Structures are given as C-alpha cells and as structure tokens.
C-alpha cells in the first residue's frame, strides 16, 4: 500500500478575493439599486442584505455593512465595528472598487459625519 501526501489547500489571497467580490457586486449592483429605489415601505431589507452579503463574503467575511441612498448616489458603508485591525483590509477593499461601481455608488469605511 502506497501512501501519498496531499498538498495543503490554501485559500486565495485577499487581493484575489477582493477582485472576485467586486466582480460579484458589479453583477448585482443594478438589482440592488432597483430594490432600494422601489422599496418605499422597507419590506425588502433582508433581501438586500443577503444579496449584498453574498457578493461581498468572498473577501469580507463577517463584516457589517449598510446600504442606502443619499439623494445623489447609492451608498455602501463598511463597518470596522470599532476594531482597528479590521480597518485596513476594509480601506484596501474600498480603494479597489471598480469605476463601473463608483459611477452610482459611494463606498465608505465607517460612518461619515
């Protein structure tokens, strides 16, 4: 009987996961905007969070976020939840947002005062 070593399986690095997450977000952002625009009674909040969370989870696991509209642009607000260690990956993620997303969305890290 021969034994084989299996190679360790590494997850993709954060840069690659960030690219994948933005690609996924780009595919659903029109739908997110339509939901935000038409959901006047705020009945579809869970659906919004689920769709957006599924797109972002490739890069950002367990990250809190908010979605909204400020009167001019849609907003995705990523929260470091008071943890400095979460701040730097979120800022990197924010800076990698594609132009196609930034046409319609402001991407923020933390609450803007």
Task: Name these PLM-found stretches.
Residues 2-66, 70, 81-113:
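Long, contiguous binding/interaction regions
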Residues 74-80:
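Short cationic amphipathic helices and targeting signals
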């Amino acid at each position: 009987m021969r034994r084989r070593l299996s190679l360790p399986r590494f997850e993709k690095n954060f840069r690659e996961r960030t690219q994948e997450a933005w690609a996924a977000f780009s595919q659903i952002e029109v739908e997110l905007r339509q939901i935000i625009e038409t959901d006047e009674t705020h009945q579809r909040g869970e659906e919004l969070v689920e769709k957006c969370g599924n797109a972002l989870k490739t890069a950002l696991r367990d990250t809190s976020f908010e979605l909204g509209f400020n009167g001019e642009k849609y907003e995705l607000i990523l929260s470091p939840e008071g943890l400095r260690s979460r701040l730097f990956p979120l800022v990197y993620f924010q800076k990698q947002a594609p132009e196609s997303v930034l046409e319609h969305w402001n991407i923020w890290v933390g609450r803007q005062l």
